[in-house]
Amino acid sequence: MMSIRRICGWIGIMLVVFGFSGFAKAQTAVEYPIAKVHNDLCDKASLQRGAMLYMNYCAGCHSLQYVRYDGMAKDIGIVDKNGHVLEKMVDENLNFISDKVTDPIKVALPKQEAESWFGVAPPDLSLITRSRGKDWLYTYLISFYADSSRPWGVNNAIFPDVGMPHMLQTLQGLQRATYKTITVTDENGKPFQKQIIDKLELESNGAMNTEQFNKAMTDLVNFLDYVGEPHKLERKRLGVWVILFLI
């Protein structure tokens, strides 16, 4: 029987082959509004929930090569009263790939094999919030909708013709898009009508309601915001102490 780790590795490659690497290629002319995410890097419970979501839904596909399990665990508060990393908890809940908590967060399938078999390897997401912005990422995560014309049966409101399945559909459910017609002008100034997405509405339920799912995606973005710049967390902590000292 194929192991869970191997299955995760295959899923990761499938996502990249069918276009998830489009994070680097996504269209820049976005007409759907970008939502504002209100994450808090000082909220360790949120960071821990986000880490759990990432490891269960994303880590089989995308590495976080600049972060080590033990360093991450210490930063987000998975430690005992003496500040020592709870390695057993990390191994049971977050580390499904490596044998050591001191290892960086990598995918199950080696990059060389992915490149040899498919010509491309899954993109690392360590810096996704810095390159795309956390608001863009949050909006992307909550904006999948049903589209029978697409290979995976879904599309994305801010990433038209997305090539990956909706990996979080079991949590969110499936949305449908309603459209509106607007008048725009072409490069010659000639007006024409164009259909764009007006809003997304939940068509079938998932394990979470909309409020719960949006909160979960805030946690996931919060975790990736931390990953993109781990020292930001320490600067925020120091900033609080400096302010208290000056008062």
PLM features: residue spans?
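Post-cleavage N-terminal segment of exported redox proteins
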Residues: 2-41, 226-231, 247
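Electrostatic cytochrome c docking/interface patches
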Residues: 28-52, 63-74, 228-236
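Bilobed periplasmic-binding protein/Venus flytrap-like ligand-binding cleft at the lobe interface
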Residues: 54, 140-147, 223-227
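Short, aromatic-rich amphipathic segments at membrane interfaces
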Residues: 204-242
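Extracytoplasmic/secreted proteins, especially bacterial periplasmic and envelope-associated proteins
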Residues: 45, 49, 53, 132, ...
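The canonical Cys-X-X-Cys-His
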Residues: 54-65, 220
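Electron-transfer interface patches adjacent to heme c in soluble/periplasmic c-type cytochromes
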Residues: 77-157, 162-186, 194-213
